[in-house]
């Protein structure tokens, strides 16, 4: 709640920037799930007294958050596609070539539903688009499942917060 309140009248823009960055731009430590849940509660009006500048309309959240998530995922895909292989080194601490090979095998075995499921796992949410791009997953397939994952992920979390906010 403090992070949303920090943005003040720019709370919606701040929320969208966080979602964009966390969805695939190599900064996996942002609290995306929590922010979406709290934003849903704010849309229900439960925390409006504490953060009157951070009021959201439910329709704004349901429209703009998936767009920010899709765009972040697409950016991550292109980062992985065009510079991803250079980022994966055999002796790297985090982005090892072995991880790219394992991710490619994971995508091959489980198909593109891994993209949808990855949305619900912090940190993984940021790395899935990068890995899909670096593993040369089909752009069309990635885009389709990125959109599905972004819409399902954001809608579920925002609506959970919204409905809980109505009963609080």
Task: Describe the residue ranges of each PLM region.
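Membrane-embedded catalytic cores of phosphoryl/pyrophosphoryl-handling enzymes
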Residues: 136, 140-144, 156-159
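Alpha-helical transmembrane segments of multi-pass membrane proteins
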Residues: 64, 68, 145-149, 153
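Transmembrane alpha-helix interface/packing and boundary motifs in multi-pass membrane proteins
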Residues: 16-35, 118
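C-terminal membrane module of polytopic membrane proteins
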Residues: 148-168
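Membrane-interfacial helix-loop-helix
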Residues: 1-17, 41-130, 134-141, 166-168
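Structural signal for membrane-spanning alpha-helices in multi-pass inner-membrane proteins
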Residues: 19, 23, 40-44, 157
